Amino acid sequence: MALLGTGCATAYRDSAADEALAEAAPTEAALSHQFTSNRLSKAQLDAFQIRAQQKLRDFIDYLTIIANPALDSAFRHIAAQQAEQLFTSPQAVVRAWSGSPGEPELVSISSFLEALIQQEGVLTFSIEQLAVDQPLVLNDSAQYEGELSFNVSGTADRATHRTGVVVKKVTKKFGQETDSVWEVFLKDIQ
């Protein structure tokens, strides 16, 4: 959320995750090992669980920006791009909710965000009752998966939503070097 900071709440959430990661890796060597190791420790998994919750909150904050036609269109499109990057892939689906009642449908994240950009009127979203339903556990693909549940205020859809969370290795470039590091992503929102 460097480009689209949402104030003290996001800064506090980032600080909590940074502190949890710092406790898990007090030295530079340990920090490097934390992100490149083949398995994660309990403390590291706890830190990534906190980061997953932050990413979900960030997604909801992005939705409020995207759904505000009073904001600059380019700014809203950048917010949509950043929101999409929180997911495992652009093909992730979202149970589309809006400010109006009706049966929500499953749509791709990109279609959902584009519909919000086209929406008439301002919508404001916030998370209520965020819970960890399934803590992060190692799967057969050498990734960690878990599940969060939450309710969203600002919508007519009062159902409990669920999203999968995955912590997987991704290739990142650090100057001239590349390395595989752990990163957390959201999956489909149902």
Give the residues covered by each predicted segment.
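A mature extracytoplasmic/lumenal domain signature
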Residues: 63, 98-100, 148-154
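Short beta-strand edge/turn micro-motifs at domain boundaries
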Residues: 141-190
